[in-house]
């Protein structure tokens, strides 16, 4: 479906979540950092419901550090958009973000949802987490797309049905 919309020769940069329909569209893409933050919040809520003996002591610090990292990256995206920082400065920041990300993801986690996210963040798609720092005009989230009239209508319809 996505290829039918974007075409076989799409050469732009998609800002997307991990929805499989977007795989193999375009050479570059930006992972939506807002979706990652939402996933981290969900992991925190779910983990908090576990009985104390089943909790992984590292999950809370993992989720807090990564929420902070993603929020700071989004702030940099805003500063890029408003020209408060240059693209050249932003490009240099990617190493800093990756270093902090990799340090935060060193410890394997027992809580499966957190471990699944940790593996994703250190896996081959890691290069797509901070694409916005390398490619001018690419935002760190797809929040704009989430607020399009079609998406708002779909969200309202789903909300009414529940």
Language model segments and positions:
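Catalytic center-proximal scaffold of phosphoryl-transfer enzymes
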Residues: 1-162
């Amino acid at each position: 479906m996505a290829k039918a919309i974007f075409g076989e020769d799409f050469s732009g940069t998609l800002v997307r979540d991990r929805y499989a329909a977007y795989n193999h569209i375009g050479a570059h893409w930006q992972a939506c950092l807002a979706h990652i933050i939402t996933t981290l919040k969900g992991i925190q809520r779910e983990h908090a419901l576990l009985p104390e003996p089943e909790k992984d002591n590292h999950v809370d610090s993992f989720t807090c550090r990564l929420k902070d990292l993603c929020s700071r990256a989004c702030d940099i995206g805003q500063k890029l958009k408003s020209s408060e920082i240059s693209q050249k400065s932003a490009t240099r920041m990617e190493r800093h973000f990756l270093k902090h990300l990799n340090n935060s993801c060193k410890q394997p986690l027992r809580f499966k949802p957190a471990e699944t996210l940790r593996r994703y963040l250190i896996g081959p798609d890691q290069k797509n987490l901070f694409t916005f720092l390398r490619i001018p005009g690419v935002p760190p989230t797809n929040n704009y797309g989430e607020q399009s009239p079609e998406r708002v209508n779909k969200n309202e319809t789903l909300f009414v049905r529940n």
